[in-house]
Amino acid sequence: SIDEAFLVLNKYSERSFFLRAEGIKKMIKKWIGIPVSIGIANNKTLSKVANHLAKKDELGSQIVEIINQKQIEISLKVLGVGDIWGIGTRIEKFLQKNNIYTAYDLYRADPRWVRQHLGVVGERTYRELHGEICIPIVERSEPKKQCRVSRSFENYVTSFEELEKRVISYATRASEKIRSDGLQAKKITTFIRSNKFNNNNKQYHAARTYDFISPSNDLFET
């Protein structure tokens, strides 16, 4: 998400976590002008739990710490299982059918049952609820090698003018995306394909690639 970030506080003492969080809130409020909520915990999943609770603390500091075992259990008891980071609607419904309604219910579940029914990803979430670190902090992602914008048309496109408008629209979106990432492209490829699910008409597909004279993220050069 563009409106959140994970920070590692290893170089600070546990006693200073809350003060550091207050300083971050004040700095963002001063520089950006928006309020933020902060969750502090031992791993990503629990920090998301803490942040979820912090957002509801509208009249308080909007900073929640989940550090020790007691804090973990108290926090998980008031959190719905569907509010756990990584638990989607389908998994939520499955868990509720098995009498797991809160995050604490999942926390208390048999780890063998979790591994059998929720797989590796579910087990990872389960272990993080118990305080383990299973999802690493990625300090810097690898630069993207390509940016793709493609859509399926709702209706048949039969005119060149309409197709041209769509291509310009997608090229605009692609250039916006690479600019937002601070990147430039060396080439651009346009491809089209007929409806592969329509067996009544002859299939068609084609692609054309244009190499830029120099790397660019300027739409007018595309």
What is each residue range found by the language model?
Residues 1-127:
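Gly/Gly-Pro- and Ser/Thr-rich, intrinsically disordered tail segments characteristic of DNA damage-repair
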Residues 96-222:
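DNA-contacting surface of Y-family translesion DNA polymerases
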